[in-house]
Amino acid sequence: MHEYSIVSALIEQCEQHALANHAAKITRVDIKLGVMSGVEPSLLQTAFDTFKLDGICNAAQLNIQIQPLVILCQDCQSESVLSERTIVCPACQSYRTRVLDGEDMLLMQLEMEQEED
């Protein structure tokens, strides 16, 4: 399950941001997850809940925003937003499409609490 390595990298990135901002803890992690990212949201959530226990994210809530697939048809120039995993143009049924969005996983926002002086 590659979600474990993804969550490990995500938590490491969160820790770097917390350190740079002198945060004592992270309370919320917002990510955007593309439908074509190859990451299963429920497995990602489970992995996050497991890995967060020993670090600065131990009280953090993970919010996952699913990013639909956005494609551009090379034949009819139609741009389409799709909620399923297909690269077929819904306008002309062409397979000659280019993915514009929906393949990535991005850290969008962190909510942190500052260290007290």
From Swiss-Prot:
Superkingdom of this protein's organism: Bacteria
Keyword check for Zinc: yes
Residues involved in Zn(2+) binding: C73, C76, C89, C92
Entries under InterPro entries matching the protein: HypA/HybF (IPR000688)
GO terms of molecular function: nickel cation binding; zinc ion binding
Binding-site positions, Ni(2+): H2
Any one Pfam family match given in the protein's UniProt record, by short name: HypA
Keyword Transport: no
Coiled coil start-end: none
Keywords carried by this UniProt record: Metal-binding, Nickel, Zinc
Annotated S-S bridges: none
GO biological process: protein maturation; protein modification process
Function, as annotated: Involved in the maturation of [NiFe] hydrogenases. Required for nickel insertion into the metal center of the hydrogenase.
Similarity comment: Belongs to the HypA/HybF family.
Designated name of the protein: Hydrogenase maturation factor HypA
Organism annotation: Shewanella baltica (strain OS223)
Phylogenetic classification of the source organism: Bacteria, Pseudomonadati, Pseudomonadota, Gammaproteobacteria, Alteromonadales
Name of the gene encoding the protein in the UniProt record: hypA
